[in-house]
Amino acid sequence: MAAPAKAQNPNPPPAATGPIYTLAFFETVAGSHGRTAKLLRGYSAATQGADGNVAILALHEIGRPARFAIIEVWRDKAAADAHAAALGSLRGALRPLLTAPFDIRANSGIDVAGDPVGTEIGAARAVYVVTHVDVFPPGKDQTVEMLKQLAEASRKEPGNLCFDVLQQDGRLNHLPLIEAWRDLAAQNDHATADHTRAFRNKLVTLQGALYDERLYQPIR
């Protein structure tokens, strides 16, 4: 009797090419904002001088003082990989303050325009938004097209400074958004705009997880 055929593994996603967007999220104990911000400023300054770095932005979540994020943009995967040890050192320095481990995700840009994130005119006072869009795999391609349409419309809003659509490496149905707005009022206008509401209404039937939208202010 012949042995049953083994199931074939699906083809792995292609290796990322072009710029790499590293997103890192972490949470700290209450009252540690000052120490955390100091470490992040030092890390940002050092990273700006690293070979292959395009942008680095440290963020503090609005209304959630214990939550932080880091956005790094690298020329390519090799440059991002070369800097991974430095990010590991930061994680080690922050370890006594952490209430949850670092969540680090590598992404590629699928609809990116304008100046690199964090270098926009008005960036020092901007409100940044990082959103994790997670859809069921069969709806990935439809969602990508919807996000491209949303990005095009959102960039035309008067208070928009940045609207980038990313795709997580290895999990192509995970589609982070990076936005920058002139202020909270501009971000609220976007949230209630017709094109945003239409997008959210379509997306809800495709979502594999809650729409995770977080608002931040930059750490300078």
Label every model-predicted segment.
Residues 10-16, 42-57, 73-106, 153-161, ...:
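An amphipathic, aromatic/His-enriched active-site/gating alpha helix that lines ligand/cofactor pockets
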Residues 2-7:
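Boundary at the C-terminal end of the N-terminal hydrophobic targeting segment
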Residues 27-38, 134-143:
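Short, surface-exposed ligand-recognition loops at beta-strand->loop->(often short) alpha-helix junctions
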Residues 100-134:
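Surface-exposed beta-loop interaction hotspot
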Residues 59, 105-115, 166, 214-219:
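Flexible, low-complexity linkers/stalks enriched in Thr/Pro that connect modular domains
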Residues 121-162:
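Surface-exposed interaction/gating patches
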Residues 19-27, 55-84, 125-134, 164-191:
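Short, well-ordered beta-strand segments in beta-rich or mixed alpha/beta enzyme
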Residues 8-14, 56-59, 114-121, 164-166:
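Short beta-strand/turn micro-motifs at beta-sheet edges
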